[in-house]
């Protein structure tokens, strides 16, 4: 069953494409804007710190997502963001850089709230879970190829204020799409449970499902080294290839193209292989891509970027599908938040480690460590297969049975 046959999902996908375009066009330009205002690389780097910080309290967002209706929550969140980004039209000088940081912080919250994935459980029958994740990742990766260039172009030609208005419009489009959806949502988690047990319920459920915990653990271990790439890639371009920093843009585009192709193929592979084997193949292919960076050749660097771009959708789709299938609707937010928090913390540590090791450790050692870690993740999942749990039906599954 393909999710694209579902009219609700098709409209949701359009809204996701439009809002993703605006999001990535703006938040990637915030760093450029901060640098232009202050002349400081550190000030630009703080933008990405503020983007990451909200992810550290993801379980709180997951708790909220499971206690309310997801569609009204998303509408309220997008409406708030449409107003927040318009504050950027007030920025004129370096002493107003705090507005950029406030917007980045708000974006970080938006990216960390797992309401979108939770809503999918109510919209789609279980048979369409894989194709839905594949379509979403393909669209997001496709958008990310064009949106940074478009965002930077609008910023340079018309200024950050105009870019903020464009982004606000994309949020309005997403709101209109959500408002047009007639969704029968599952009942929210009732009140009455103690706060701490309620907030941490996602971690406890995750631990009780061996397949989910194996996939989440592999993702966390992988993120604990992949952040080294954020530093290693610039050292590799400069010292390994002798290329200008602009070559990073070429690598990013090639990786994005690889991920679009990967998204188109990964749905079929995960459906045939299952979440565990599909994820394992993804990590193994990523290791191959990262390994090509050990040889200082522009051709191999580009090939490697395409290969690991191809791999990313495999383990992303596998983990997202497993969460969709094996987690009840009332826990989707908290389990998604638990997985997101583990990955965010691990990635933040590895990014910081990469920055600290720059100039001390050869970039090839960093890439070798990334490749070996990816192989270890593949082995962790594949060598001791976890039993496949029973699918937890959704309200969409129940409707499908009623209409059968």
Predicted regions span which residues?
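Juxtamembrane intracellular "pre-TM" segments in multi-pass secondary transporters
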Residues: 1-9, 183-217, 398-401
């Amino acid at each position: 069953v393909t999710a694209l046959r579902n009219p609700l999902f098709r409209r949701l996908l359009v809204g996701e494409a439009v809002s993703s375009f605006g999001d990535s066009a703006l938040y990637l330009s915030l760093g450029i804007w901060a640098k232009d205002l202050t002349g400081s690389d550190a000030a630009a780097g703080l933008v990405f710190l503020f983007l990451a910080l909200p992810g550290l309290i993801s379980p709180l967002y997951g708790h909220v997502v499971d206690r309310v209706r997801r569609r009204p929550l998303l509408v309220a969140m997008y409406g708030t963001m449409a107003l927040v980004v318009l504050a950027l039209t007030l920025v004129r000088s370096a002493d107003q850089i705090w507005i950029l940081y406030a917007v980045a912080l708000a974006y970080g919250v938006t990216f960390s709230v797992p309401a979108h994935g939770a809503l999918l459980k109510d919209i789609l029958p279980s048979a369409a879970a894989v194709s839905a994740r594949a379509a979403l990742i393909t669209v997001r990766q496709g958008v990310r190829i064009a949106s940074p260039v478009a965002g930077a172009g609008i910023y340079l030609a018309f200024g950050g204020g105009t870019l903020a208005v464009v982004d606000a419009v994309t949020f309005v489009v997403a709101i209109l799409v959500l408002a047009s959806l007639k969704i029968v949502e599952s009942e929210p988690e009732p009140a009455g449970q103690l706060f701490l047990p309620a907030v941490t319920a996602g971690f406890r459920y995750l631990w009780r499902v061996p397949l989910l915990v194996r996939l989440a653990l592999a993702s966390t271990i992988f993120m604990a080294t992949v952040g080294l790439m954020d530093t290693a890639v610039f050292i590799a371009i400069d010292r390994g290839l002798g290329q200008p920093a602009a070559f990073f843009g070429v690598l990013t585009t090639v990786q994005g193209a690889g991920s679009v192709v990967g998204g188109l193929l990964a749905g079929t592979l995960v459906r045939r292989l299952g979440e565990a084997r599909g994820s394992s193949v993804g990590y193994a292919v990523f290791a191959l891509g990262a390994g090509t960076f050990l040889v200082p050749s522009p051709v191999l660097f580009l090939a490697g970027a395409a290969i690991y771009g191809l791999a990313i959708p495999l383990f992303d789709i596998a983990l997202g599908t497993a969460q969709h299938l094996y987690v009840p609707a009332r826990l989707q937010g908290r389990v998604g938040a638990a997985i997101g928090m583990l990955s965010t913390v691990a990635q933040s540590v590895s990014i910081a480690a990469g920055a600290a090791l720059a100039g001390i450790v050869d970039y090839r050692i960093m890439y070798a460590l990334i490749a070996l870690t990816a192989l270890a993740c593949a082995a962790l999942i594949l060598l001791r297969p976890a039993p496949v749990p029973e699918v937890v039906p959704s309200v969409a599954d129940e409707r499908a049975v009623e209409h059968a």
